[in-house]
From Swiss-Prot:
It comes from Mus musculus (Mouse). This is Oligophrenin-1. The gene is Ophn1. InterPro entries: AH/BAR_dom_sf (IPR027267), BAR_dom (IPR004148), GRAF_fam (IPR047234), OPHN1_BAR (IPR047267), PH-like_dom_sf (IPR011993), PH_domain (IPR001849), PH_GRAF (IPR047225), Rho_GTPase_activation_prot (IPR008936). Stimulates GTP hydrolysis of members of the Rho family. Its action on RHOA activity and signaling is implicated in growth and stabilization of dendritic spines, and therefore in synaptic function. Critical for the stabilization of AMPA receptors at postsynaptic sites. Critical for the regulation of synaptic vesicle endocytosis at presynaptic terminals. Required for the localization of NR1D1 to dendrites, can suppress its repressor activity and protect it from proteasomal degradation. GO terms for cellular component: actin cytoskeleton; cytoplasm; dendrite; dendritic spine; glutamatergic synapse; terminal bouton. Residues 617-627 have a biased composition (Polar residues). Residues 716-732 have a biased composition (Basic and acidic residues). It is found in: Postsynapse; Presynapse; Cell projection, Axon; Cell projection, Dendritic spine. The lineage of its organism: Eukaryota, Metazoa, Chordata, Craniata, Vertebrata. One of its GO terms (molecular function) is phospholipid binding. Interacts with HOMER1. Interacts with AMPA receptor complexes. Interacts with SH3GL2 (endophilin-A1). Interacts (via C-terminus) with NR1D1. The record marks R409 as: Arginine finger. Residues 265-368 form the PH domain. Keywords: Cell projection, Cytoplasm, Endocytosis, GTPase activation, Neurogenesis, Synapse. Its main location: other.
Length: 802
C-alpha cells in the first residue's frame, strides 16, 4: 500500500493529517533502517561463513594431500597407481577452486556491507537529524506562540510589535525545518530503491561469477574423473573376484577345517572333554586330541595337570564311534568311542554340534537309532485323524479352560507337546489318547493344536488363495474387504473350508469370554494369522505381509455369522477398491529436474573489437570487462524464425519487447548438463536476424520483458561459443579471475528499437554520451519513453515491422 505524498504547502499549515502522513513515512523509514541492519548482519554472517567454508575446504585438501596409500604385495597395477595419486589431484583441484572463491570473498564486504552501511548512516542518519531539528523547532515555536497569545493587549505597542516579530521568526524557522525534513524523508524514501538493491545485485553478480568459474573447473575435471572412475571400476572387479575366492576358502575352512590341512598334519585335531568315572563320582577332563584316520590313532594330551603327577600324551587305537543319544546324558555334543587299549566306552564332549560332526565324520561314526519322527509330511495332513484331533482339542478347551487368561498365548512344554502328538498320531492306534488325563494341561492342548495347524503340508487357507486374501486385506474399502474375503472363503476346498469354519467358530467362542481370558479378535488374529495362512516362499516381502494375514483372521472372527450364513450371491459383486495411493500424473519440478523450456541468455552492452583482449564472457553469458563495470544483465526474447516473420503460436507480449540477438537454447537439468560436459562436439554458431552473435566483436543492447521468473541459464558460454561447454581450456592454461564489479550495472532501456540491417553500437559500445549519467536519469528516460507508447504497438513483435 502506497503512502500519500507530502505536499510542501502542508508544511506551513502543519495540520493533524499532515502529521499523520509524516508519521507513516517515519515508521517506514524505521522499518527500512531495521531491514538494512538485518541485511548487514546476515550478509556479514554469510561472508564470514563463506570465508570459514573456504578455510575448511583448504584444510580438507591438505588432509587429503597428506595421506599416502599403502598396498599389499610388491607392485601396483596402473589402475591402482591412478587411485593412489587421486587424493593429490583432488587437493590441487580444491585449492584452485578456493583460491578463486577467496578473491570474490575479499571484495564482498566492499560490494555489500559498506554501501548499505554508508546509506544507513549518511542518508537515514541525516534524516533522523532533520527530524530532531524539526521537532525541536516545532516545540520552540508552539511554546513561544502560547506565551505570545497570553500577552495582554494593554502592553506597550513596542513590546507587542517585538513579540510579533519573534513569533514570525520562529514560525519561519519552523517552516524551513519542516520543508527540509519533508524533502529529506521523501528523498530517502525514493532513493532507497536503488541504494539498497544495487549493492545486493553487485554482491550476487560476483557470487554467481565465482560459481560459474567453478563450473569451468568442473569441465576440466571431467576427463580425469572418467579415467579415475574406470580405474575404480576395474579395481572393484578385481576385488570382487578375489573376495569370492577368499570367501569360498573361508567357507571350506569353517565347514571342514581338515580339508585345508597341509601334508603331514593329522586328519583332525582340537579340544575335547573326556568323561572320567571315579569311585566318588564323575568328572570331566580337558584334552587336546589329534586323530590320524589312516592309522586310526587318537592322541590325547591332558591340559589340566594334576599336582604331584606328571601326565604325558596317551595314544589310543580307535575301534568304534557312535553319537551319544541326547536323552541319555545331561551334557551336549557328546559321542562315544571304543579303543583297543581301554576296556568299555569312552565318552567325549565336543565344543559344538558342528565340531562333533567333524570328529564323527573323521572317525566314521554312526548315528543312534530313533523312533519315526512325528512331523513327517504324511502324518501332518488335513485328514480324518486331523479333524478328530482338532475337535478333541476344541472340546477340551471349551470345557475346561475357555476362561483361562492368555489362552493360546501362553506356550506349553515342548516335550509334552511332542509326547501328545506322538501318542495321538501313532500309526498303530491313531487318536487313542485320553485328553482328560492329568498329564495334559490347557497350555499343552493349545500348543499342540497350533503345532498341528502350522505343520500341515499346506496351510488351512491354502497357498493358492494367499495372495488374493492378502490383497483383499490391504484394501481401504471396508465393504470390499469383507465381500472379497467372503467370496474367497467359499473358493477353499471343502475340507479346508470345513476345518476353517470349525476353528473360527471356536475362536468366536473364545473371544466371547475376552473379559476373562483377555483374548480379543485382534489378539486371536495375531496368533492364528501365521497359523492359518502362510506364504509358499520364505522371503522378506512375505514376512511383511503377516500383519495382513492377521487382519484376515480378525475379519473372519468378527463377521463369522455373515460369512458362514451362506456363500455370497452371484449378482453381488464386491465394490472396486479405491487405490491406496493416487497415481501421480505430473512429476514434481525440482531444481535438478525441470521441464525443458526456452532458455534466457544474458548479455551486456556491446564492446569494441579492439578491446576483445580485456573482455571475458562469463558462464552465464555475461561479457565483463576488467576495466569497466559491466552493464545490467539483459534478457533476450525467444528466437525468431526469420526476419519479418512471427511465430503463429506465440502470444503477443503484454509490453513492448525490444529486438535483440537470440538463439534457441533449452534449459537443461543436471544430468543433461553433465552429458553436455562430456560431449566434445561443437555446434554451428546460429546467426541472428539483426546482427552477429554476441562475443564476436559487436553486440547490441537489448531487453526482454519477463512475464514470469526467467529460468536460470545452465549453459556456459565463452567467446563466440554459443553451445556451451564445448571449448576446453588447455591443461596448462590458468583461467583469468574476473573481478566483481565496483558498482552495480545500469538498468536497461525498455524502448522499442527498430530493426536495422547493420548492428549499430549503442550504450556500452564505448560512446559515453549515450550512457545515462545516473540510475535516476536512466529510469526517467524509461518512463518518459514508455508513456508515449500506444497500446497498438504491444501486439507486435519487433521483427514484424520488417
Amino acid at each position: 500500500m502506497g503512502h500519500p505524498p507530502l505536499e510542501f504547502s502542508d508544511c506551513y499549515l502543519d495540520s493533524p493529517d499532515f502529521r499523520q502522513r509524516l508519521k507513516y513515512y517515519e515508521e517506514e523509514l524505521e522499518r527500512t533502517n531495521k531491514f538494512i541492519k538485518d541485511v548487514i548482519k546476515d550478509g556479514s554472517a554469510l561472508i564470514s561463513a563463506m570465508r570459514n567454508y573456504s578455510s575448511a575446504v583448504q584444510k580438507f585438501s591438505q588432509t587429503l594431500q597428506s595421506f599416502q596409500f599403502d598396498f599389499i604385495g610388491d607392485t601396483l597395477t596402473d589402475d591402482e597407481i591412478n587411485i593412489a595419486e587421486s587424493f593429490k589431484e583432488f587437493a590441487e583441484l580444491l585449492n584452485e577452486v578456493e583460491n578463486e572463491r577467496m578473491m570474490m570473498v575479499q571484495n564482498a564486504s566492499d560490494l555489500l556491507i559498506k554501501p548499505l552501511e554508508t546509506f544507513r548512516k549518511e542518508q537515514i542518519g541525516f534524516t533522523k537529524e532533520r527530524k530532531k531539528k524539526f521537532e525541536k523547532d516545532g516545540e520552540r515555536f508552539y511554546s513561544l506562540l502560547d506565551r505570545h497569545l497570553h500577552l495582554s493587549s494593554k502592553k506597550k505597542e513596542s513590546q507587542l510589535l517585538e513579540a510579533d516579530l519573534q513569533v514570525d521568526k520562529e514560525r519561519h524557522n519552523f517552516f524551513e525545518s519542516s520543508l527540509d525534513y519533508v524533502y529529506q524523508i521523501q528523498e530517502v524514501q525514493e532513493s532507497k530503491k536503488f541504494n539498497i538493491v544495487e549493492p545486493v545485485l553487485a554482491f550476487l553478480h560476483s557470487l554467481f561469477i565465482s560459481n560459474s568459474l567453478t563450473v569451468e573447473l568442473t569441465q576440466d575435471f571431467l576427463p580425469y574423473k572418467q579415467q579415475l572412475q574406470l580405474s575404480l571400476q576395474n579395481t572393484r572387479n578385481h576385488f570382487s573376484s578375489t573376495r569370492e575366492e577368499m570367501e569360498e576358502l573361508k567357507k571350506r575352512m569353517k565347514e571342514a577345517p581338515q580339508t585345508c590341512k597341509l601334508p603331514g598334519q593329522p586328519t583332525i585335531e582340537g579340544y575335547l572333554y573326556t568323561q572320567e568315572k571315579w569311585a566318588l563320582g564323575i568328572s570331566w577332563a580337558k584334552y587336546y586330541c589329534r586323530y590320524e584316520k589312516e592309522t586310526r590313532m587318537l592322541t590325547m594330551i591332558p591340559m589340566e595337570q594334576k599336582p604331584g603327577a606328571k601326565q604325558g600324551p596317551v595314544d589310543l587305537t580307535l575301534k568304534y564311534c557312535v553319537r551319544r543319544k541326547t536323552e541319555s546324558i545331561d551334557k551336549r555334543f557328546c559321542f562315544d568311542i571304543e579303543t583297543n587299549e581301554r576296556p568299555g566306552t569312552i565318552t567325549l564332549q565336543a565344543p559344538s554340534e558342528a565340531n562333533r560332526r567333524l570328529w564323527m565324520e573323521a572317525m566314521d561314526g554312526k548315528e543312534p537309532i530313533y523312533h519315526t519322527p512325528i512331523t513327517k509330511q504324511e502324518e501332518m495332513e488335513l485328514n480324518e485323524v486331523g479333524f478328530k484331533f482338532v475337535r478333541k482339542c476344541i472340546n477340551f478347551i471349551e470345557t475346561k479352560g475357555i476362561k483361562t487368561e492368555g489362552l493360546y498365548r501362553t506356550v506349553g512344554s515342548n516335550i509334552q507337546v511332542q509326547k501328545l502328538l506322538y501318542a495321538f498320531f501313532d500309526p498303530k492306534c491313531p487318536g487313542d489318547v485320553d485328553f482328560h488325563n492329568s498329564d495334559w494341561d490347557i497350555k499343552t492342548i493349545t500348543s499342540s493344536l497350533k503345532f498341528y495347524l502350522r505343520n500341515l503340508s499346506e496351510p488351512v487357507m491354502t497357498y493358492k488363495l494367499h495372495k488374493e486374501l492378502v490383497s483383499a486385506a490391504k484394501s481401504d474399502n471396508l465393504d470390499y474387504r469383507l465381500g472379497a474375503i467372503h467370496s474367497l472363503v467359499y473358493k477353499l476346498p471343502e475340507k479346508n473350508r470345513e476345518m476353517l469354519e470349525l476353528l473360527i467358530k471356536h475362536l468366536v467362542n473364545v473371544c466371547e469370554h475376552s473379559k476373562e481370558n483377555l483374548m480379543t479378535p485382534s489378539n486371536m488374529g495375531v496368533i492364528f494369522g501365521p497359523t492359518l495362512m502362510r506364504a509358499q516362499e520364505d522371503t522378506v516381502a512375505a514376512m511383511m505381509n503377516i500383519k495382513f494375514q492377521n487382519i484376515v483372521v480378525e475379519i473372519l472372527i468378527e463377521h463369522f455369522g455373515k460369512i458362514y450364513l451362506g456363500p455370497p450371491e452371484d449378482s453381488q459383486v464386491p465394490p472396486v477398491p479405491p487405490p491406496r495411493v493416487t497415481a501421480r500424473r505430473h512429476k514434481p519440478i525440482t531444481i535438478s529436474k525441470r521441464l525443458l523450456r526456452e532458455k534466457t541468455v544474458f548479455y551486456t552492452s556491446s564492446l569494441d573489437e579492439n578491446k576483445d583482449e580485456s573482455h571475458h564472457q562469463t558462464p552465464n553469458g555475461t561479457i565483463t570487462s576488467n576495466l569497466d563495470p559491466p552493464k545490467l544483465l539483459q534478457h533476450l526474447k525467444p528466437p525468431m524464425q526469420k526476419s519479418g516473420e512471427t511465430d503463429p503460436g506465440r502470444k503477443s507480449p503484454s509490453r513492448p519487447v525490444s529486438d535483440c540477438q537470440s538463439e534457441p537454447c533449452l534449459e537443461t537439468d543436471v544430468g543433461r548438463l553433465l552429458f553436455r560436459l562430456q560431449d566434445g562436439g561443437t555446434k554451428a554458431t546460429p546467426k541472428a536476424s539483426n546482427g552477429p552473435v554476441p562475443g564476436s566483436g559487436h553486440t547490441k543492447t537489448s531487453s526482454f520483458h519477463i512475464r514470469r521468473p526467467a529460468p536460470r541459464p545452465m549453459a556456459h558460454h565463452k567467446e563466440g561459443d554459443t553451445d556451451g561447454f564445448s571449448k576446453v581450456r588447455p591443461p596448462g592454461e590458468k583461467q583469468t579471475i574476473i573481478r566483481p564489479p565496483v558498482r552495480p550495472p545500469d538498468p536497461p532501456c525498455r524502448s522499442i528499437t527498430p530493426q536495422k540491417p547493420e548492428p549499430k553500437p549503442e550504450t556500452g559500445s564505448g560512446n559515453a554520451d549515450e550512457i545515462p549519467s545516473s540510475v535516476v536519469a536512466s529510469r526517467t528516460r524509461f518512463f518518459e519513453t514508455a508513456s508515449r507508447k500506444t497500446g497498438s504497438s504491444q501486439g507486435k513483435l519487433p521483427g514484424d515491422e520488417s
